Design a protein with these regions (language model features):
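Conserved phosphate- and dinucleotide-binding cores of soluble alpha/beta proteins
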Residues: 1-143
């Protein structure tokens, strides 16, 4: 973990990341960017496990590692094409919130909606609480 602070620089030197596939977590987290403890302007960062558990007491820690290392929201914004997968009935409520709620640290994945080339792929179960209007998405202005 001693060189994580240069990961973003090394990725940029190599030409960046063309496509990244990530998943939406049951509570709105992504890539270990958890509610109430994700710095929304972070590049790749390390976070002490106890910080995550204090901010999210319902989490179960099944890891002996004292730190999590992850790409923060600012790092993911540099990916050329970001793809989010949402699957399962158990994610239907959080998926609806992800689409409708304002961007916040309570639901960190909402920041991903700002990505300029963002694709969401959801199965029927995950989309089961969405209306036809929700599924159409925001209107796009045509030139």
């Amino acid at each position: 973990m001693e060189n994580y602070e240069t990961f973003d620089e090394e990725i940029a030197k190599a030409g960046g990341i063309d496509v990244m596939l990530i998943g939406l977590g049951w509570d709105g987290h992504f890539c270990s960017n958890c509610p109430r403890c994700t710095p929304m302007d972070a590049l790749t960062y390390a976070r002490a496990r106890h910080v995550t558990l204090e901010a999210n007491p319902n989490y179960k820690s099944n890891s002996n590692h004292p730190y999590s290392l992850t790409m923060g929201p600012a790092s993911l914004m540099k990916v050329k094409h970001l793809v989010l997968i949402v699957n399962g009935k158990h994610k239907a409520e959080i998926f609806k919130k992800f689409l409708k709620e304002p961007i916040s640290e309570e639901l960190p994945a909402t920041i991903l909606r700002l990505h300029p080339n963002f694709t969401v792929i959801a199965d029927e179960d995950a989309a089961s609480l969405l209306s036809e209007e929700d599924l159409r998405g925001p209107a796009k202005k045509l030139d």
